């Protein structure tokens, strides 16, 4: 079959490449700025077996916890959300006994905390609860331990859901029960105090002002965020340049300077910044 001309061909590859490059937009090295950061501080009040009274030896822990509460309460950039009291009894001893025990530990801990907060004139909501048998805590501690027959104990927990049967099956593993009684179970007899609070960051106005007047007062996330508060490329460039000086080991400011240069049509300058970003990433 003889060749038949259909149409004149064109070489469009170079044109397509140029169009693609012309429309390309390098990725921004984004900040991780959070105005409100949630934090917490924990402390454990420990109890003796089958006891719910708070011993004098535990008052030091309570005092240190209250000191942290006071520090957060007094800080201008922090706000207390609440204080949690989570009281527990270890799984040995039976459900009925441990229910009463855990409830009494919760009540005694909450009373102590309320008294301390009132004395310090701190108004903070308290959320209290108790867990009669802390099987979750037991499983976690056993999992992290190196005790004999660990896998057998964990298998018992997965096989039986009834607490009385669990306890009996574990007691039947006589070779390890004394170790559990000495090393694991005492850690579960506790009231956990949890101070939940927020760290409140600078406002947009504060960040924008500091970025131009005193950028050294800003951390890297705040400084990178400051550049997003303006649409002026010149101001963005100034902020990113300052960020490279304060935080030379963070690639994002170099990357973002490269992005600005590329968008301005300065490919050589953009390439230089991108190479620098790659070298510190």
Regions found by a protein language model. Name each.
Residues 1-281:
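N-terminal targeting segments with Sec-dependent signals, encompassing both cleavable signal peptides
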């Amino acid at each position: 079959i003889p060749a038949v001309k259909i149409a004149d061909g064109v070489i469009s590859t170079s044109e397509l490449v140029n169009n693609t490059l012309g429309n390309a937009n390098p990725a921004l090295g984004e900040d991780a700025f959070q105005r409100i950061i949630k934090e917490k501080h924990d402390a454990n009040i420990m109890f003796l077996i089958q006891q719910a009274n708070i011993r004098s030896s535990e008052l030091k822990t309570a005092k240190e916890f209250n000191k942290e509460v006071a520090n957060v309460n007094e800080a201008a950039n922090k706000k207390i959300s609440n204080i949690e009291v989570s009281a527990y009894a270890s799984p040995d001893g039976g459900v009925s006994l441990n229910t009463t025990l855990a409830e009494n530990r919760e009540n005694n801990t909450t009373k102590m905390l309320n008294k301390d907060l009132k004395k310090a004139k701190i108004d903070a909501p308290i959320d209290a609860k108790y867990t009669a048998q802390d099987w979750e805590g037991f499983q976690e501690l056993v999992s992290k331990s190196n005790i004999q027959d660990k896998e057998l104990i964990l298998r018992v927990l997965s096989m039986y859901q009834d607490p009385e049967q669990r306890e009996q099956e574990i007691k039947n593993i006589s070779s390890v029960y004394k170790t559990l009684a000495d090393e694991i179970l005492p850690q579960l007899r506790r009231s956990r105090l949890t101070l939940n609070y927020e760290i409140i960051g600078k406002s947009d106005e504060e960040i924008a002002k500091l970025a131009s007047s005193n950028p050294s007062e800003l951390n890297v996330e705040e400084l990178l965020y400051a550049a997003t508060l303006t649409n002026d490329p010149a101001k963005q460039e100034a902020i990113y340049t300052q960020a490279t000086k304060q935080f030379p080991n963070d690639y994002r400011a170099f990357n973002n300077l490269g992005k600005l240069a590329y968008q301005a049509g300065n490919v050589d300058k953009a390439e230089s910044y991108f190479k620098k970003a790659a070298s510190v990433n």
